[in-house]
Regions:
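Active-site-proximal beta-strand elements of phosphoester/diester hydrolases
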Residues: 5-13, 121-127, 246-247
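Acidic, His/Gly-rich catalytic cores of divalent-metal-dependent hydrolytic chemistry
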Residues: 138-286
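Active-site neighborhood of divalent metal-dependent phosphoester bond hydrolases
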Residues: 49-52, 56-176
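N-terminal active-site segment of His-dependent metallophosphoesterases
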Residues: 1-58, 71
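Active-site environment of divalent metal-dependent phosphoester hydrolases
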Residues: 15-17, 43-45, 69-76, 131, ...
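Residue-level marker for buried hydrophobic side chains located in beta-strands
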Residues: 8, 37, 64-65, 122, ...
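A short acidic-Thr-Gly-centered motif at the start of a beta-strand
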Residues: 1-2, 27, 55-57, 112-117, ...
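Divalent metal-coordination and catalytic microenvironments
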Residues: 11, 40, 67-68, 105, ...
Length: 286
């Protein structure tokens, strides 16, 4: 008899065929197994509508994080942002079940922290600021999640975008506070050693601007004692370091859609990586 399995999956970005093939490869059973998805469920891939419908049908078997593309969908749907040239969101926006899909999306998380067979894992889409603990990260994510599920959603989306403030300060309040939280959890790649973020550079770790470094290399990072799992950074690719799992392997760019099984891991041994090849749907930006 097969036992329950827990899987962590990287950025799907609307590639439903790849998701279906990955679920078949792991013999996923929604009545038995559980998925944790690291955000960017939609956009740029050919069928984000099918992705949302599939994940929504899975109910409690799928725990989804929100990425920057998922928040972009909400902003476009509420008339806050124009669609971008390479967006593939029309199917969702024109679907009869648009209201239920968007309502479901607003119920998803920005951070998850749990223990899997003795391993504490913090899941985010993009990154964590060095001053934040895992527990604090989940609490701060909860502040944004409450807004996404409340009556002030549209107003929040109108003010969510922007690069400032670029650093965390516990005294921040209002939209400045919420914007820093969103930017860290859904957009962060590089920061200064003391946690000042920048968003112009999207390449690999070697493209860090002077004075900046990958967020996970910040000295004194307070989540260094837990495993942080994240997506978002396709130029980074699959990365497994002590207490670090990067799972955006560029599915939409013709890379792979990746999963690891969490419940069969052995402490201090590599996780087993499971992948399916993806068809390129977009050309990577240079």
């Amino acid at each position: 008899m097969n036992t329950m399995a827990l899987y962590l999956i990287g950025d799907i970005q609307g590639c439903d065929n790849a998701l279906q093939r990955l679920l078949e490869k792991i013999s996923f059973s929604p009545s038995r197994d559980t998925l944790y998805l690291l955000g960017d469920l939609v956009n740029r891939g050919p069928d984000p509508l099918a992705v949302l419908r599939r994940l929504m049908r899975l109910g409690a078997s799928a725990h989804c994080l929100l990425g920057n593309h998922d928040l972009h969908l909400l902003a476009v749907a509420h008339g806050v942002r124009p669609a971008h040239q390479h967006d593939t969101l029309d199917g969702i926006l024109q679907s009869a079940d648009r209201p239920s899909l968007l309502a479901w999306l607003c119920q998803q998380r920005l951070a998850i922290f749990d223990n899997f067979r003795g391993e504490d894992i913090l899941m985010v889409h993009a990154g964590v600021l060095p001053a934040w603990t895992a527990t604090q990260t989940v609490a701060l994510a909860g502040e944004v999640e409450a807004i996404l599920r409340g009556p002030d959603l549209a107003d929040f989306l109108h003010h969510m975008y922007g690069n400032e403030p670029s650093a965390w300060d516990g005294s921040l309040h209002g939209i400045d506070r919420l914007r820093v939280i969103v930017n860290a959890l859904t957009r962060l790649r590089f920061c200064t050693p003391d946690g000042r973020m920048e968003f112009k550079h999207h390449g690999g770790v070697e493209t860090a601007p002077p004075g900046y470094l990958p967020w996970f290399d910040a000295p004194g990072r307070r989540t260094a004692d837990v495993t942080v799992a994240f997506g978002h950074w396709s130029r980074l690719g699959w990365l497994e370091h002590p207490h670090l799992l990067a799972l955006d392997t560029g599915c939409v760019w013709g890379g792979h859609l990746s999963a690891i099984r969490l419940d069969d891991s052995v402490p201090n041994r590599p996780h087993h990586l499971i992948q399916v090849q993806c068809e390129a749907c977009q050309t990577p930006e240079i």
